[in-house]
Amino acid sequence: MGNEFQHRTVLLDEAVDALVTRPDGVYVDGTFGRGGHSRAVLARLGYAGRLIAFDKDPRAIETAESIEDARFEIVHDSFAAMKGALDARGIGRVSGVLLDLGVSSPQVDDPARGFSFRANGPLDMRMDPTRGESAAEWLARASVQELTEVIRDYGEERFAFQIAKAIVARRAESDRLGPLDSTGELAQIVGHVVKTREKGKDPATRTFQAIRIHVNQELADLQVVLEAALSLLEQGGRLVVISFHSLEDRIVKRFLQAHASAPAVDRRLPIRAADLPRPPLKLLGRMFPNDAEVAANPRARSAVMRIAERVAP
């Protein structure tokens, strides 16, 4: 397979250092991508260690299948299927779960995948192009209200209503102009609506992010996998999550904080702190790429990595 679209793994050493606590453990890479984290984890594991990786992208699966290592297995599915997939393999507990969220550089850089507003391509945006509804198919049927809600909530775009109306107006011209099915035309529509400019950011950035998140159910899947990871982690096991925008990070932060805090109790009740159940997680902090990594890989700029450890059985 060609490697014309390269991917630089963000926070590679930092993530693996945080994740791997014992070489003979079972680990999960929820987002194989092009395998940067997985290969680094395998390098840390001993003979008895094991790594199960997940990815929806068929091209990622092709890359993973080139890894000849008996300790490694790739699953062609969303990380939201993690619990069921591990149950089917007789794995009830794991030593660590790594999630590197969002879209990978090869997906963005390949115009044929339909993620990018910088180069024209088919309006697809599916991480697995063989499953589900494409962006073009969704845009062809969504109401102004649904479009507005998605673009506003997932893109944090203040011109969401105006963009939604412009998309529906263009759709009404489909008999004359053909379907809205290219990234270039969608970016052009958004650019005509969004007159203000954020420094260093294309006006279509927020809308494309929103549609991509919706098409791939990214935030819903994130909620599912966080719960799955918590249930799978053994005592001392680590959860390491790298996110790239505020919506993802907010979900991760709130989840970790909720499971690292003691339950609230009315102070008037005769209950001691020692009598309360111990929170399952301990927060081990967050990390950001250093200046050198950002200089070498500008896409790392927005990354934040959060780490938690399971401390209660």
Curated annotation (Swiss-Prot):
InterPro entries, per database record: RsmH, SAM-dep_MeTrfase_MraW_recog, SAM-dependent_MTases_sf
Function as written in the Swiss-Prot or TrEMBL entry: Specifically methylates the N4 position of cytidine in position 1402 (C1402) of 16S rRNA.
Main location: cytoplasm
Keyword field: Cytoplasm, Methyltransferase, rRNA processing, S-adenosyl-L-methionine, Transferase
Reaction(s) this enzyme catalyzes, per UniProt: cytidine(1402) in 16S rRNA + S-adenosyl-L-methionine = N(4)-methylcytidine(1402) in 16S rRNA + S-adenosyl-L-homocysteine + H(+)
Endpoints of the signal sequence: none
Any coiled-coil regions, as ranges: none
Biological processes annotated in GO: rRNA base methylation
S-adenosyl-L-methionine found in the keyword field: yes
Any one GO MF annotation of this record: rRNA (cytosine-N4-)-methyltransferase activity
Ligand binding (S-adenosyl-L-methionine): 35-37, 55, 79, 100, 107
Subcellular location(s) per record: Cytoplasm
Protein name: Ribosomal RNA small subunit methyltransferase H
Organism field: Burkholderia pseudomallei (strain K96243)
Pfam families cross-referenced by the UniProt entry: Methyltransf_5 (PF01795)
Classification via PANTHER family: 12S RRNA N4-METHYLCYTIDINE METHYLTRANSFERASE (PTHR11265:SF0), S-ADENOSYL-METHYLTRANSFERASE MRAW (PTHR11265)
EC identifiers of the protein: 2.1.1.199
GO cellular component annotations of the record: cytoplasm
Domain of life: Bacteria
Family that this chain belongs to: Belongs to the methyltransferase superfamily. RsmH family.
